[in-house]
A protein has these predicted regions:
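C-terminal outer-membrane/trafficking sorting elements
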Residues: 4, 9, 14, 21-25, ...
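C-terminal PAP-associated
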Residues: 26-531
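Exposed beta-strand and adjacent loop surfaces of beta-rich binding modules
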Residues: 138-140, 197, 255, 313, ...
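Residue-level signal for well-ordered, solvent-exposed loop/turn and beta-edge residues enriched
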Residues: 149, 181-182, 407, 569, ...
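Surface-exposed loop/edge segments in extracytoplasmic proteins
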Residues: 150-154, 210-213, 569-573, 648, ...
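Proline- and Ser/Thr-rich low-complexity, intrinsically disordered segments
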Residues: 531-557, 569-574, 583-772, 814
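Exposed aromatic-hydrophobic patches
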Residues: 579, 649-651, 818-824
């Protein structure tokens, strides 16, 4: 059967048209409407996965950065008619510190879902059920078992596709409702489009691989606004989703909407009954609804960061939802103020947080409210702050505890007053013991972007959390802007309570993946109430050959320690606090077993690459007057040459020893290059004697007069040190003598030689007559010489290149010599025939046809 037909028959798809009724008017600037969803569909997750696998969706990058980017929320003062004042005064470096107690390590940690190069930021979210884990990102949706094994993965678009008209979904968030054992999932769809919608999905059971009800609502019938950044909460009667609206033209913040869904309706296969509140009098938005872990209060709370500096005070607002499931009532805001102030973002809301190895910063967004939870009648809230107010140099996580009236009971900031460590994108959970886990992103110039958390026990000193615990260190540098201007991270994370015990915690955080410029996500399961083997390292990022000191941090006194160090020397140890050397680059797991209990940390030690030590020299000879270029083999990094230069390549003109101190792009590993010795040799002194004029028909001249001996001659008519005047032709010619020293340095001298008919062809008084007939000849010639003295006669035939091609000696000592010579074996051409008496010679030109 066609798989698409099977899918359609199984899902029982149907639609419902929105119906709105006007509710009673509330405060000015707030309207409310009641209605039902525009579209509802029933789906099965595994069948969605089956259809997606069949259709093989495109992996072409979505690049949310183009249409859907981080929207800046303008500052606006809150209503000051009903103000709750923070009683704790101003922060100081002393009261901003942690309790000084170590946060517990995780009992388990593993990978969630990684970068598929289709979206920045990923918008990290996840939730935990009794048997499953779900991860929802801008890219994909994944279901895992509780040990981290992947059960199924689909794209975010595919999950929502049954609603129809879905081309671009974003900003997913997911929760597990422990009251009803259901999964709650919201997203936005179609940014900057007339089809802009809010989406809600609820599972039919605690098993997310099975049935779901999906709902879609068009957020603006006038098609002048679009929706961004939903926040979701729930209690025993409502599922509440808040989102921000922006103008279609210019994307200016206009208002925000709060959809209060009747939980009983959507859980019982209803049409999607909701009440919508639209607030236009506080465009600063991000009114974050509360997540309830018990039924200690019938109200739901909606928290907002109004301003980091409202007349010298930081300002929040609290609204409440009360009433019945079908007729919720939204209260006017209560204003909460503190004498502490903060900036709403880093400079111009751009890249802000540092990372190891590169100057590229990472965007930490703004101070919007991120997460609100309720437990035992206490409201906990977290958001980022940027400090100081004027010219922020760092980011931190500000946390609050309120009573249900908005009175501040605790608050503080997790931050580093020295400005070395940055924290952002917080999320919080509170268990039945009123212990708290706060997860967040951790940044520093000494680490890659990492995932971390801090724990608070209910009996810890007021206004304190325990020390930061980095449970997943980043593994590489990160920069990805898809052609935009911001190196996006976040936009959020999630921290939740385990529904099986209401005591242990889970947090999912983003970290820089092992592949350069990729993000990834990682889960940590934290149980503060059990014996947990744990350890720390004095350095998680080392260079080859460096050592790491490991310290046992287990929360119980163990008697037996068994360490295993992948990539380390030694590879194992039974010491409580061993020292291990890492000699090769890579990302290495460390395992500690204490009394049979195991703690394993993947990629815990990152051994970075040392820079390449080589220096390349160009082919220019080291001779005085030349310039030699030296280039470091390391293609990128920081360079510090022995000359003081800081470029990769330098030019050298003087003798000496040269080297470069190189820092690798990771910013951590440095070493000195190989040394290069350059010795510039002096150029030789070359001279050349003058030449006499020569007849064009004269025999080729062996050139001499160049010093030092052993050089070469060059010029017109010169070959192998012989000058042939007939080849050079009439005129004045330059002869150059070049000498190369043993060091390879050369110098030259030049003189001119004149070829002219004014000079005879070797006139000689001892030879009174010299004839060659016939000339031209077919090869057989008659040679006649008169006036020969009593000496040996040597006759030579020389070609145009000065080579002797025929020779013969005669010992007839008569005054007249006549000889017949056969030269027919020679190739046709022009030659010289020379009669040589030793102390005198005569030459004539000879043509052989």
């Amino acid at each position: 059967m066609n798989i698409n037909l099977l899918f359609k028959r199984t899902l029982l798809l149907f639609s419902v048209i929105s119906v709105f009724t006007q509710a009673d008017a509330q405060e000015a600037g707030v309207t409310s409407l009641q209605g039902i969803a525009d579209v509802k569909k029933e789906v099965n997750f595994m069948q969605i996965a089956l259809v997606e696998a069949y259709n093989k969706p495109s992996t072409k990058p979505i690049q949310f950065i183009g249409n859907k980017k981080a929207r800046e929320i303008p500052e606006m003062d809150a209503d000051l008619s009903n103000v709750k004042m923070d009683p704790f005064g101003k922060y100081t470096d002393a009261n901003r510190t942690s309790s000084g107690i170590a946060s517990p390590g995780p009992i388990n940690n593993f990978n969630g879902l990684n970068d598929n190069s289709t979206s920045i930021p990923p918008d990290v979210n996840g939730a935990v059920g009794p048997n499953h884990i779900m991860v929802t990102l801008n890219t994909q949706v994944r279901i895992q078992d509780r040990s981290g094994a992947t059960l199924s993965t689909v794209t975010l678009n595919s999950f929502w596709a049954p609603l129809g008209g879905i081309t671009s979904t974003y900003d997913p968030k997911i929760l597990y409702d422990h009251f009803s054992n259901r999964w709650l999932f919201c997203s936005s769809a179609e940014p900057q489009s007339n089809s802009s919608s809010t989406l809600l999905a609820v599972s039919k059971t605690s098993d997310p691989t099975q049935g779901w009800n999906l709902y879609k609502i068009d957020v603006d019938a006038t098609n002048t606004k679009w929706v961004d950044y939903p926040s979701i909460g729930f209690n025993d009667r409502w599922i509440t989703v808040q989102m921000n609206l922006f103008s279609m033209a210019g994307s200016t913040a206009t208002s925000h909407q709060i959809y209060v869904w009747d939980k009983a309706d959507v859980y019982n296969n209803g049409a999607g009954v909701f009440t919508k509140f639209e607030i236009t009098n506080e465009s600063t938005a991000i009114v974050c609804p509360s997540i309830h872990y018990d039924n200690s209060t019938s109200k739901m709370f909606l928290m907002r960061v109004a301003s980091g500096n409202s007349s010298g005070k930081g300002t929040l607002t609290m609204r409440t939802l009360s009433g019945t499931a079908t007729t919720p009532v939204l209260s006017a805001p209560t204003t909460i103020q503190t004498n502490n102030t903060w900036a709403s973002s880093g400079a111009n809301n751009t890249n802000f947080a540092p990372q190891l190895g590169v100057t590229s910063l990472i965007a930490t967004n703004d101070h919007r409210m991120r997460h609100v939870v309720v437990r035992d009648g206490k409201v906990w809230a977290v958001h980022s702050v940027f400090l100081p107010l004027s010219g922020a140099t760092r980011s931190g996580v500000q946390w609050w505890q309120f009573d249900t009236l908005g009175n501040v009971q605790q608050r503080n900031i997790i931050e580093d007053p020295t400005g070395q460590r940055f924290y952002s994108f917080p999320s919080i959970a509170v268990n039945k013991k009123n212990d708290v886990l706060l997860g967040y992103a951790s940044f520093a110039p000494t680490q890659y972007a990492s995932g971390a958390y801090s724990f608070r026990k209910s009996t810890d000193p007021i206004n304190t959390f325990r020390d930061e615990y980095v449970f997943k260190y980043g593994e590489n540098t990160y920069f990805k802007d898809f052609g935009g201007t911001r190196n996006r991270w976040g936009d959020y994370t999630n921290t939740v309570i385990d529904p099986t015990n209401d005591s242990t915690f889970w947090t999912i955080q983003e970290y820089a993946g092992s592949v350069i410029n990729t993000w990834a996500t990682w889960w940590a399961h934290v149980n503060p109430y059990t014996d947990i083997p744990d350890f720390s390292a004095d350095n998680n990022y080392v260079c080859p050959g460096e050592s790491v000191v490991f310290t046992n941090k287990s929360n119980f006194s163990g008697s037996s320690f068994q360490w295993t160090f992948a990539g380390g020397t030694p590879a194992s140890s039974t010491d409580a606090n061993p020292t291990v050397t890492y000699n090769t680059s890579g990302r290495f797991r460390v395992t500690l077993v204490v009394d049979g209990k195991t703690q394993l940390k993947d990629g815990y030690v990152v051994t970075l690459a040392n820079p390449v030590r080589g220096i390349n020299k160009n082919n220019v000879l080291p001779c005085e007057g030349n310039t030699i270029t030296l280039t470091a083999s390391q293609a990128s990094g920081v360079y510090s040459w022995s000359t003081g230069a800081t470029t990769r390549a330098i030019q050298v003109t003087q003798s000496g020893t040269y080297y470069c101190d190189i820092t690798a792009p990771n910013g951590l590993c440095s070493r000195r290059s190989d040394s290069v010795v350059i010795t510039f040799a002096p150029a030789p002194t070359v001279t050349l004697a003058d030449f006499n004029a020569i007849n064009p028909n004269a025999t080729p001249l062996q050139l001499t007069g160049g010093t030092p001996a052993g050089g070469t001659y060059a010029g017109p008519g010169v070959s192998n040190g012989v000058f042939t005047p007939s080849v050079a032709g009439l005129g004045t010619h330059t002869i150059t003598y070049t000498f190369v020293s043993p060091e390879g340095c050369s110098a030259s001298a030049s003189k001119t030689i004149e070829v002219t008919n004014a000079v005879g062809v070797n006139a000689n008084t001892k030879i009174t007559a010299f004839s060659v007939t016939p000339n031209p000849s077919k090869g057989l010639i008659n040679l006649s010489i008169t006036g020969v003295s009593n000496s040996n006669l040597k006759v030579q035939v020389i070609d145009q290149l000065g080579r002797i091609v025929w020779t013969k000696n005669y010992d007839d000592y008569s005054q007249n010599i006549k000889k017949e010579i056969d030269l027919s074996s020679l190739p046709k051409g022009a030659y010289f025939i020379k009669a040589d008496l030793g102390e005198a010679s005569e030459t004539q030109k000879l043509i052989i046809e």
